[in-house]
Amino acid sequence: MAFRKLAVAAAAVTLLSACGDNNLFNATAPTISDVYTVFALTGTPPAYPSALDTYFRQPVRVDGAGSFDVAFDIDPSGKVIIYPVKLVVRTLTGERRIGLMRVTGDFDLVTSAPKATYQTDSALVVSPHEVVVIEAARNGSGDACQFALSPNIYTKLIVDSVAVATRTITLQTVMDPNCGFRSFEEGIPKN
């Protein structure tokens, strides 16, 4: 039995080597910058986009399918509450791991996602101009990183402004669409 496993492993290595793809673990897509306006979860109609799908780079409405990464609300003091999807809805397909991390410093100077533990089990309350990095696992069935060595897509965001009267939040983001890559620098990432 051990010989059979060894033979299968050797065949797999040979097959991968024969493909001749020297860029197997290189990023292929550039980082992407966007600006969004989303609505608060409370005090707005449910059809309004109150969440963000970081991989597809679009504000979306909160739905029972959990087809978003984070949702936003405004607390009584005007700060923004960022919720990972699992704190907003429970889906039939199970939880997708979304982590949040507050990062000190200027938005433009945060050039890569930190290699640390991301907060996955609680919301994050931020003031305008605070930087947050989102770690979104994208390794579900049919997902972007289903077969990648690292299942995570990283996005940094900053709340540019909060309009309490209209319950809107303006965000600026930079997303690295390459599975496992952490760079927020312009162009195709190297790490």
List each model region and its residues.
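Surface-exposed, beta-sheet-biased, low-hydrophobicity segments with strongly acidic/polar composition
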Residues: 19-191
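Sec-dependent bacterial lipoprotein signal peptides
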Residues: 1-19
